[in-house]
A protein has these predicted regions:
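ATP/nucleoside-binding phosphotransfer catalytic cores, i.e., glycine-rich phosphate-binding loops
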Residues: 238-308
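N-terminal glycine-rich "phosphate-gripper" loop used for MgATP/nucleotide binding
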Residues: 65-76, 80-81, 100
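ATP/NTP phosphate-donor binding region
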Residues: 1-62
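Conserved beta-alpha junction segments in alpha/beta enzyme cores
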Residues: 10-16, 172-208
Length: 308
């Protein structure tokens, strides 16, 4: 496993060290560990350092899995100078690259520029470091991450009531799986780093976010709706929207209210499915961004499969 730190610096200097130690105990050789110590203002190093580290991915051995240290902010600064084609060639040769949150901007930029597949999944600090009294990475996360890395496969059934489904209440869809952090994705609308309507036509869009009040979630979803992104999909998957706070003046307005306001404006043949185990949470799937996926759904949940 080759670590990169292209976004924010660690909030707790012990977190990456704990994650590295746990991975080593599992028999994983962890490379480029020195990146976890870099600090430049709020970033994990200067722009030049972080850009060089990202572009260095093009030269890595194909049996290596690349994992980002954490999210935050920082990759937007680098987009114009990333060597997209060279990194895509390394992926074509077998390299796998994983992260989420701010890393969404790299994944969607790479998809827009080259069509290369990356993995939306765990990162070092949150997913492999101390959670509570001990280092206990989520078993579900670890199992699906290993399956993605070793078998290049996603196969999961989610049992969760589906309140946003319209009739028909069951069906099947297939399409390119893509998406990530909603705030990051919405910020790419109108830029060359968001995959085009042609690229994502009939796609399966997955979304998550953290620390965003439901009205902000609604506003960003409305932006994607008005930009033609949502109605261009064959399905929309909602992951975790966590760590927000409701206020007295919400008067019953909830995350469900926000999603329903957007959902009712979508064509009835586009299922909006919730409960995807993905986001800023311990239990998360590893999702292939840019790969074909297949979903079967009804009012009690859905299954998702992909092989890449």
């Amino acid at each position: 496993m080759h670590l990169i730190a292209p976004s924010g610096a660690s909030l707790d200097a012990s977190s990456p060290l704990q994650g590295i130690e746990w991975l080593q105990k599992q028999g994983v050789e962890v490379l480029n560990t020195e990146c976890v110590n870099r600090v430049e203002q709020r970033f994990a190093g200067s722009d030049a350092e972080r850009l060089a580290e990202v572009n260095q991915l093009a030269k890595l051995s194909p049996e290596i899995a690349v994992v980002a240290m954490r999210g935050g902010y920082g990759l937007h600064r680098l987009l114009a100078d990333i060597q997209w084609s060279a990194i895509a060639k390394a992926i074509q040769n077998g390299l796998q690259i994983c992260g989420h949150s701010d890393f969404t901007v790299f994944q969607l930029g790479l998809l827009a520029k080259t069509g290369a597949v990356t993995l939306a999944g765990p990162m070092l600090n949150f997913d492999f470091a101390c959670q509570g009294d001990s280092i206990t990475p989520n078993a579900f996360m670890w199992a699906h991450f290993q399956k993605a890395i070793n078998e290049r496969k996603l196969d999961c059934t989610i049992q969760a009531a589906q309140p946003f489904l319209k009739k028909p209440v069951q069906g099947k869809v297939s399409g390119m799986l893509w998406g990530g952090n909603l705030t990051v994705l919405a910020g790419l609308v109108g830029t060359p780093y968001l995959p085009t309507q042609e690229q994502t036509h009939g796609g399966i869009l997955f979304l998550e976010d953290v620390n965003e009040h439901p009205y902000r979630i609604e506003r960003m979803l409305m932006q994607l709706l008005d930009a033609g992104v949502l109605e261009n999909q064959s399905a929309i998957l909602l992951g975790g929207f966590s760590a927000y706070r409701l206020y007295d003046n919400d008067r019953g307005y909830t995350l469900e209210s926000a999603i329903e306001a957007v959902s009712k404006r979508l064509p009835g043949n586009i299922p909006v499915l919730s409960g995807l185990p993905f986001g800023h949470q311990a239990e998360k799937l590893t999702l292939p961004v840019g790969a074909q996926a297949h979903i079967q759904y009804d009012e009690s949940g859905f299954s998702i499969q992909s092989q890449w």
